[in-house]
Amino acid sequence: MTQKLQMADRFDASAVEQALYNHWEQKGYFKPSYDAGRPSYSIAIPPPNVTGSLHMGHAFQQTLMDTLIRYHRMQGDNTLWQAGTDHAGIATQMVVERKIAAEENKTRHDYGREAFIEKIWDWKAYSGGTISQQMRRLGNSIDWERERFTMDEGLSEAVKEVFVRLHEEGLIYRGKRLVNWDPKLHTAISDLEVENKESKGSLWHFRYPLAKGAKTAEGLDYLVVATTRPETVLGDTAVAVHPEDERYQSLIGKTVVLPLANREIPIVADEYVDREFGTGVVKITPAHDFNDYEVGKRHNLPMVNVMTFNADIREEAEIIGTDGQPLTTYEAEIPQDYRGLERFAARKKVVADFDSLGLLEKIQPHDLKVPYGDRGGVPIEPMLTDQWYVSVKPLAETAIKAVEEGEIQFVPKQYENLYYSWMRDIQDWCISRQLWWGHRIPAWYDEQGNVYVGRSEEEVRSKNGLNSSVALRQDEDVLDTWFSSALWTFSTLGWPQQTKELAMFHPTNVLITGFDIIFFWVARMIMMTMHFIKDENGKPQVPFKTVYVTGLIRDEQGQKMSKSKGNVIDPLDMIDGIDLESLLAKRTGNMMQPQLAEKIAKATKKEFPEGIQPHGTDALRFTLSALASTGRDINWDMKRLEGYRNFCNKLWNASRFVLTNDKLDLSTGERELSLADKWIQAEFNKTVQNFRNALDQYRFDLAATELYEFTWNQFCDWYLELTKPVFANGTDAQIRAASFTLVNVLEKLLRLAHPLIPFITEEIWQKVKDFAGVEGETIMTQPFPAFDEALVNDEAVAQISWIKEVITAVRNIRAESNIAPSKGLDLLLRNLPDTEQKTLENNRTLMQIMAKLDSVKVLAQDEEAPLSVAKLVGSAELLVPMAGFINKDTELARLNKEIEKLIGEVKRIEGKLGNEAFVAKAPEAVIAKEREKMQDYQEGLEKLRAQYLSIENL
């Protein structure tokens, strides 16, 4: 029985992918089975911010996650990929504030809190939908009915529950402390949201008069204090010297008069002071500097806050003791002339006033790092504010132990050290933010300022016996976005309820994330999860067993992708394509720095003169997997993307060759397996083993290489060719065997490839399954190929390997000698071992057809051979007589010309690379390209010289 199928000339990704995905989703193939008898496998997606669209980093990480989910689903595991989005407090509020400012010329205050939050929910509905659709285009096999948002009702309940319990345990407290304050966004931000920028500044040297007639060792009646922040002078509460600095030892415990404010402040000794910095005397301003804050605590200094939340000088100083309570016994009046001044205007005035008083010693240029808020984009101010904190040290101990004892493993392992360094030096976590968008802090205040924490106002009243006559107001602040994200693995599964999902899918198996949020998110998830989730024996549960840390995706030059550089590539543009005009509009529109638009447009036109061609999702996924070397950053390469699109086409064409073959015979008669049939089964079996080992160790790059190597170099380039003589001249039994092997290896290959390239494999599998006698609705629930000891066949692999080497050697001789493929050659073999002689006898006809040989002869040891081109294969010498095929002199002249040309190219590049100025100035990528060219030219030169010698010896 022969079978034949009609198949399109090429795979049309744009026509197939979305239709296939819709079919999968409608059929419910992505849902977990909830079969308790199966092993569970789950991944919680790092929730993308609801603020915008997916970028290459998302596409990269989600491709790896989906690969693992599909791989485990095909192994029969009960799989859950828990997806969702993050409310992203500051980022989302900023986006919507900018939107209403641009479109309506309004601020959030014009709307009021409730109406503004409604605006954000509208934005979330729009933006969240965009992200979900983009994730579908990537082929992500997510159970969309379980999609979550960090401010869903269920997750909000979990957040309140955690806050209340931690507060009851004394691990959440409210206190006045120094925080990073963003004066533009009016909120506290974490250290990790602060970007230190190099800046050319000044170091001002001010004279602080000594009080009560004191003098320095040199007889001066003042100390010179060096500072980079004159605007905070009014908040000084001490000056400090190093306790071992002999210049000032006699002055320790005495006082200076603070200029402008005219109050006495002490001279304290503290090892924090660097004797080499400035004069070795520094001013201490505990309310406006983190180091000074610590010095102030050590010396019990008052904290004088002279700035408003706008970073203007206050009308009246706020004076706080080291216990965080108001201090009424200390006086620090702000002079009238400074009140209400913007901070940098105040700086100028302070310097001018010191100068006019004769107290400005000198000004020095000084390089410094200025801390900026990464979202607000303005210098942050250390600010004394009332904030909520989590005391994390007790939580950190358990989390450190989990990694030390191997309950959680980092891949690559080096990231464990980064984790430990953060966790062993952990500070209390400021969890309150002065925003409107987010989880509102579940705390209420009465008119006397008493604080009540509870899950709701009703609970607070009931628990504390507060009737309706007691007025309560809820805390205005919201929680840090990372607080709710830290609960992600268990809150999405229904906690605090004890759901079947929580029992079945927690802990999750792996977290795939970037190194930049190991502390922001990973560490906090470990701490929170282990504190709240316990197994049946009361042992803390980890949120995940493995943390796979990815590198960054950079552009082809190794630059980080960013809007300001104009080098961002949208993953969907590589899938669907984009014309140049639209690409330019995307890269240069809505820029924070519009002056860069022209430069970006020029670079884009050079890189993508025709825009970006469509490549389809499978090609993008395969490229991302192939580039995923463990933990390393990836330099994006469009040529690799094109190459892997060609790979997908190769798989399609190979399938088309098999399924449209007129001679294909899958009838039930006798089958006589050829050497090639046994070989391809053994090779595929080995590929399955290597592929599975690679994925089990998160080596997506090695898995992709295995798949590519087998599909292109073994199945397509060799096995399909080796079957052609069988279909042309074989017996019925041999044709049936080749047909059976072709179809069955192809069907298994599609299953092997499915986790990486789901669309094309499903499309082909739907056509091949009937040929292979396989039942099932979809490839994604078919069993994943397993290694089979019975298919190991080292003998067949060795024999075909030798046959391939001989055929390749003959083909190389033909190409090197410019002999047309239509001309038959004779092959002489000398020193042929017995095993290879036997292989030759059994496969002589096949080898003659494949290498286009008229004859094959084994020479005796002492038998003379005519003038021939020779190659070695193992210990055997291959000789192809050249008489009548080439004109020796003409061929040598041609080769000599080619050799001279390459020598010239090598010298040119040697000159470039030997030029120190070029090497110093040229980008690394350009130098690497030149070295690569040099290697190619040198290898080419070697081959040409070898050809020259071969022909010269004829």
Swiss-Prot record:
Q: Which domain of life is it from?
A: Bacteria
Q: How does it assemble?
A: Monomer.
**Domain description:** ValRS has two distinct active sites: one for aminoacylation and one for editing. The misactivated threonine is translocated from the active site to the editing site. The C-terminal coiled-coil domain is crucial for aminoacylation activity.
Q: Where is this motif: 'HIGH' region?
A: 48-58
Chain location of the short sequence motif 'KMSKS' region per the record: 560-564
Q: Does the keyword rRNA-binding apply?
A: no
Q: Which Gene3D superfamilies match?
A: HUPs, Isoleucyl-tRNA Synthetase, Domain 1, Valyl-tRNA synthetase, C-terminal domain, Valyl/Leucyl/Isoleucyl-tRNA synthetase, editing domain
Q: What is this protein called?
A: Valine--tRNA ligase
Q: Name one GO cellular component term.
A: cytosol
Q: Which PANTHER family match?
A: VALINE--TRNA LIGASE, CHLOROPLASTIC_MITOCHONDRIAL 2 (PTHR11946:SF93), VALYL-TRNA SYNTHETASES (PTHR11946)
List the keywords (alphabetical). Aminoacyl-tRNA synthetase, ATP-binding, Coiled coil, Cytoplasm, Ligase, Nucleotide-binding, Protein biosynthesis
Question: Among the record's GO biological process terms, what is one?
Answer: valyl-tRNA aminoacylation
Identify the enzyme class: ligase
Among the GO molecular function terms of this UniProt record, one is:
aminoacyl-tRNA deacylase activity
The answer to keyword Nucleotide-binding applying to this record is yes
Location in the cell: Cytoplasm
- InterPro entries associated with the record: aa-tRNA-synth_I_CS, aa-tRNA-synth_Ia, Anticodon_Ia_Val, M/V/L/I-tRNA-synth_anticd-bd, Rossmann-like_a/b/a_fold, tRNA-bd_arm, tRNAsynth_Ia_anticodon-bd, Val-tRNA_synth_C_sf
Q: Where, if anywhere, are coiled coils annotated?
A: 886-954
**EC identifiers of the protein:** 6.1.1.9
Q: Which reaction does it catalyse?
A: tRNA(Val) + L-valine + ATP = L-valyl-tRNA(Val) + AMP + diphosphate
Family, similarity comment: Belongs to the class-I aminoacyl-tRNA synthetase family. ValS type 1 subfamily.
Task: Return the HAMAP family for the record.
Answer: Val_tRNA_synth_type1
Q: Which CDD domains match?
A: Anticodon_Ia_Val, ValRS_core
This chain's function reads: Catalyzes the attachment of valine to tRNA(Val). As ValRS can inadvertently accommodate and process structurally similar amino acids such as threonine, to avoid such errors, it has a 'posttransfer' editing activity that hydrolyzes mischarged Thr-tRNA(Val) in a tRNA-dependent manner.
Organism per entry: Mannheimia succiniciproducens (strain KCTC 0769BP / MBEL55E)
